[in-house]
């Protein structure tokens, strides 16, 4: 809760069944009213083009707005993404951890070149929690779009630095990948990340790479929003500290 607020300051079973035919040869299931859920998710999956990897600097997501207020400056691509999200999210206009897990794992099924054990529900709950500005346990449109853009950018970085095409990043590749994603880390923090997210051989698979960057991005943004005088120091109470560390 505290983390999410700090960041903003500076139909589950039916979906699962529909996703079964996504990216496969089977037909797509239609929900009542003619909604083609597979097509909706497919549109979201293909929303971000496969651009070349580039330097990425973490930025705060846009502040939460009323979902029906579509700014005139929005591109046609974003409008289409918003429409697809509306149908995917359902009446509450938010996507939960289970939906996110299904979407991410279906995306992974397209990329056989990425070594991964898949995104677990616990991992997706953690991802949702650091992005959840209103503590509903779900992601609204702006939050989801921000996350999705980052995942696609980081996927490009991951593939660029997997130079031996092993599907995972070794210790010699990981440091460069983190820097290309926009994170300059000291040796102590780098070693902590390796111990937390890599395997015993020091290799990191795709889902752990994304989980690591989501957390890094969120913590950098949280610190920046709390460091109001920009002196590189923050002061928090025990209550704020517990909220910051427990709901993430």
Curated annotation (Swiss-Prot):
Annotated PANTHER family: CALPAIN SMALL SUBUNIT 2, CALPAIN, SMALL SUBUNIT 1 A-RELATED
Protein name: Calpain small subunit 2
Residues annotated to bind Ca(2+) 3: 162, 164, 166
UniProt KW keywords: Calcium, Cell membrane, Cytoplasm, Membrane, Metal-binding, Repeat
Span of domain EF-hand: 119-152, 149-184, 185-213, 214-248
Cysteine pairings via disulfide bonds: none
InterPro entries recorded: EF-hand-dom_pair, EF_hand_dom
Residues binding Ca(2+) 4, per UniProt: 117, 205
Residues annotated for Ca(2+) 1 binding in this entry: 89, 92, 94
Quaternary structure, from the entry: Heterodimer of a large (catalytic) and a small (regulatory) subunit.
Annotated compartments: Cytoplasm; Cell membrane
Functional description taken from the UniProt entry: Calcium-regulated non-lysosomal thiol-protease which catalyzes limited proteolysis of substrates involved in cytoskeletal remodeling and signal transduction. This small subunit may act as a tissue-specific chaperone of the large subunit, possibly by helping it fold into its correct conformation for activity.
Top-rank taxon, per record: Eukaryota
